[in-house]
Amino acid sequence: MTLTKRILGSLLALTVVVLGALYWLGTRDDTSTGPAAAPSDPQQRIERGRYLALAGNCVACHTARGGPAYAGGTPIPTPFGTLYGPNITPDDKTGIGAWSADDFWQALHNGKSRDGTLLYPAFPYTEYTRVSRADADALFAYLRTVTPVSQANRPPELDFPYDQRILLAAWRALYFKPGALEPDAGQSEQWNRGRYLVEGVGHCAACHAPRNSLGATRPADGLTGGVIPGLEWYAPPLTNDPRAGLGRWSAQDIADLLQTGIAAHSSAS
């Protein structure tokens, strides 16, 4: 065997190993926080789920303008093409009516559909992975109570090669690690609740953090502001900076903005 053939063989073997490692990293599941939540009062669980759906603004991506609630169809433009929010009503055929709580948890926590298909990260499972199992079950319980709508989901309209879903394994290997958000014992209960809302169900980084050329955010950048891909709309920083961020804002200022869409220190949202 010539030296050239040996080198080529070694490179081929190395390529296979690297691709295999990327595929494994990109498709692995985290089951450490996966058991179903302990039974609780059904109505309280549904009400908790309704609160979470509002906090996460699920309706924004899962309700087309003028369409039925949570029936999907909302176009989500990205630099790679357009995706459409799916139907998450309890319709058995076109929604999530045939899903179990475990299936729903799989989507939020591991970024996979009911059949194991890798989900595109326009669905922010990079943040939703931090949602607790109890809250995932509550959100699922609430969605089971909304009016079922028979409306087929629109397939993604992505450019090549981004339409090759298998490539998501490499993206996930680089930018996604499923896992729970552990409370910081050195901080107050209120602080930890705020962190959970911001980094989990509220998925604030999805808009308020800069993205790289592959559409991924970096934890090191924090909530320093960023342009929302495809919309070319700038989401301002949510840091404590007194000039560019929220340093001069009171808790009431933030509450007013979230409730009314009107900011006391900047433009209307």
Question: What positions do the PLM features span?
Answer:
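Electron-transfer interface patches adjacent to heme c in soluble/periplasmic c-type cytochromes
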Residues: 78-105, 126-134, 221-260
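Extracytoplasmic
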Residues: 53, 83-85, 118-120, 202, ...
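C-terminal capping alpha-helices of c-type cytochrome domains
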Residues: 20-24, 100-114, 127-153, 249-264
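N-terminal type II signal-anchor transmembrane helix
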Residues: 1-33
